Amino acid sequence: MRLFALLPVLLGLISSHFVSATDNGKTTDVTWDKYSLSVKGERVYVFSGEFHYQRLPVPELWLDVFQKLRANGFNAISIYFFWSFHSASEDTFDFENGAHDVQRVFDYAKQAGLYVIARAGPYCNAETSAGGFALWASNGQMGSTRTSASSYYDRWYPWIQEIGKIIAANQITNGGPVILNQHENELQETIHSADNTVVKYMEQIKAAFSDAGIIVPSTHNEKGMRSMSWSTDYQDVGGAVNIYGLDSYPGGLSCTNPNSGFNLVRTYYQWFQNYSSSQPEYLPEFEGGWFSAWGGSFYDQCSTELSPEFADVYYKNNIGSRVTLHNIYMVMGATSWGQSAAPVVYTSYDYSAPMRETREIRDKLKQTKLIGLFTRVSSGLLQTQMEGNGTGYTSDASIYTWALRNPETHAGFYVLAHSTSSSRAVTTTSLNVNTSAGALTIPNIELAGRQSKIIVTDYQTGDGSSLLYSSAEVLTYATLDVDVIVFYLNIGQKGEFAFKDAPTHLTFKTYGNSKVSSAKSDHGTKYTYCQGDGTTVLKFSHGVLVYLLDKETAWNFFAVPTTSNPRVAPSEQILALGPYLVRTASVSGHTVSLVGDNANATSLEVYTGNSKVTQIKWNGKETPTKKTAYGSLIGSAPGAEHAKLSLPTLKSWKAQDTLPEINPDYDDSRWTVCNKTTSVNSVAPLTLPVLYSGDYGYHAGTKIYRGRFDGVTATGANITVQNGVAAGWAAWLNGVYVGGAIGDPDLAATSAELEFTSSTLRRKDNVLTVVMDYTGHDQANVKPNGSQNPRGILGATLLGGDFTSWRIQGNAGGEANIDPVRGPMNEGGLYGERLGWHLPGYKGSKTATSESPLDGVSGAAGRFYTTTFKLDLDSDLDVPIGLQLGASADAPAVVQIFMNGYQFGHYLPHIGPQTRFPFPPGVINNRGENTLAISLWALTEQGARLSQVDLVAYGAYRTGFNFNHDWSYLQPQWENNRGQYV
């Protein structure tokens, strides 16, 4: 490493607080010091959100998400690259087909104006199957994972080389958006020794990324305050990264008890001082929500986790702790479609994130925007020292304060919240602050329950104005033709502010319903008001314009960047107020053009700072425009409240048997013979031959086994199956149901003793068929072998005889990846899946019946239902559409939903909780024909049926974003070559 001066130092003006920046010896485009990260020589507050492109398999929608994040104050995204998604078999990698084309991730991020933090593992966790390890490698052949073992290294190294080259080409040094690269994921350094295998592993990763050409700084994410790992400032014996990070999920919230948890962690600052004091404080994963497990609560029920108060209190607490790199996990969770989920989650990965699984903006994201826009312009926040903290700063000891000070500009940032952060008390207090004008007491600061405020002092608000202090929170400011300051408060709360070095005899005019008064003080004129409903604007005689917004009005305020640079200067913004979303804004001649979305028609106020601009265009159409006395433009933005959303009733179903393998005479001669007597897996099988599905090249989805034996003396069989928690299975002897297990959300493996009767036995060629559901491969923390815990049958013992043979069938082609667009985890081994009945273009057999899923099946059996329907939504609408299912919880069953070939729903009605399954545009055709397929098999003789199968709309938005593409490249059609996989 080497040191160089980050900022030019004027002779004779060298500050005692000057800190040189550190680089990694490979590039000076990204540097750091103990305060913040710098990109291209400028400090930046990294306000980032976690997004997983694999969970939204429509590349065009990545730009939709990125634009929404940029509009809501984010300047970066953090992205996992899952090895499992790109590698179906050893030495094969797909970075081209459909959503596997990761170059588009980088291109869209750059277009939207977002930095990228790359996280390629090789292990990722992320509640994805096998934690992101390629499933072909997760059958045990990696040996001792996450160590320096050669068996592991030989498998992950090619992955890092392939994805690493793409990341390298998109580094900021090459004009791309990548500024940081993470090594591994939450890997604890429990033994600080250069000879330790985990330390050697981290050195291997460092070398591998370097071999791939990556030169931006490296990072890692500590798994909570559980160990001290990979910091150059603490027992560095090897494997350390450039910038240490700490993951934290402190909420402790409950979906069923809104009064639980909500306890802030106030020890981050000390932790970073102890273990990474020379580096900026970085939270690579901070709670944006939490995942939900099989049998738990659905995300929409988790009101506390979804609350905007969570974002307000927790994210501001991080600012008070001096964090300047802040990544929210997840900012949008999306969907664990196909067989990509780890067993700990069901299909939805909504995560209670600020952005809904359906790409809709929650109030939680709107509140987060208030913080993001503040950090964007608050340059003084990027170089602060901890002046103090505790309950002694306010007149009420129930309030806790963080006090930060910029040693060069002397700007102060006081972050207030209730000392008992879960408190719902409404408290009014005064705050003692230090300013350039001396010590002051700011009165009448009200904190509602679960509210936090950032009080600023000596805060620059433009080229010609500064605030001496303000008890109203700063949302943002802009330096346009005049300095524009935007404040926000809850309705009814009092605000007070004073300018620094303002002209004497300053006057102002008020536009709006908040009454503002001025009074002389020892430190100039102070302005006080009580926040009314909506917007009030103050126009001061020295040119400054002040917007006073109530909080919920502020949720619909946008400071739209006029640059694609993630670092936005206060002068590079157009201010807009009113709509649900403003994506972009630009000025041409006399017109300001805005592109955005609206659910309901709203007013639209725009401030450009350009007196020549007299006309507003919204989504390409002029809107009647008038000019206000303070220089803004007023128009309107239409909504979708009157849009006709006519979703068809699903009918004209075709049904076929999807478990013909139950029939003992079914021809399985093309199936894979299970004849191995040893396994690559270190977990020994309970019986032989080995019946682990991974040993035979079948990894994701349903598996079917057929065991044979002769004679009539067998009384039963002991079968143990392991296919993930909640995964059930069923068995048939010679076509007769003999038992199984319905699945348990607490058990990954289940056993059953199947009972045979003489009437079901044959003298020759008895066939035991075992069909099993699959909920994913485990993550690394699951004993005994983590991501390599075997799947399939662990043991099969015939009582009163011996099996003579076993065969297995899984997804069509196994590791061949015969559908590279949808990828290696989309399909399982059900007969209908293998033959492609779920794919567009499949017309159905002549023997298909007209039954629907509402008819269901009698007894332990399975059916595959298909239908088609057309949608013709307005071209300027974004309508998230899903499928609502219902079924009795007393009839155990396994249901899968396929939309245009994509498995976008795994429904277990007896376990739950998910019953509604959304489809993004591109998976569903909002303007065109769609193929819907549903597989249903009953786990018991009770049979099963669905009680509801309906298309539903989550919302409707008039939009300027183009959702009308030819999606055919994402929806390969059925081909008449699937018969080989019977």
Swiss-Prot record:
Cysteines joined through disulfide linkages: C255-C302
Key words, A-Z: Carbohydrate metabolism, Disulfide bond, Glycoprotein, Glycosidase, Hydrolase, Polysaccharide degradation, Secreted, Signal
EC number: 3.2.1.23
Catalytic activity: Hydrolysis of terminal non-reducing beta-D-galactose residues in beta-D-galactosides
SMART domains, A to Z: BetaGal_dom2
Signal sequence annotation: 1-21
Superkingdom per UniProt: Eukaryota
Similarity section: Belongs to the glycosyl hydrolase 35 family.
Matching Gene3D superfamilies: Beta-galactosidase, domain 2 (2.102.20.10), Beta-galactosidase, domain 3 (2.60.390.10), Galactose-binding domain-like (2.60.120.260), Glycosidases (3.20.20.80)
Gene label: lacC
GO BP terms in the entry: polysaccharide catabolic process
Task of the protein: Cleaves beta-linked terminal galactosyl residues from gangliosides, glycoproteins, and glycosaminoglycans.
Alphabetical list of PANTHER family matching this protein: BETA-GALACTOSIDASE RELATED
Compartment(s) where it occurs, according to its Swiss-Prot or TrEMBL record: Secreted
Cellular component terms per the entry's GO annotation: extracellular region
Main EC class the enzyme belongs to: hydrolase
Keyword flag Cell division: no
Predominant place of localization: secreted
Residues that carry a glycan: N274, N389, N434, N600, N675, N718, N785
Residues at the active site: E186, E285
One Gene Ontology term of the molecular function aspect: beta-galactosidase activity
Annotated residues for binding of substrate: Y80, N125, A126, E127, N185, Y249, Y351
Name used for this protein in its record: Probable beta-galactosidase C
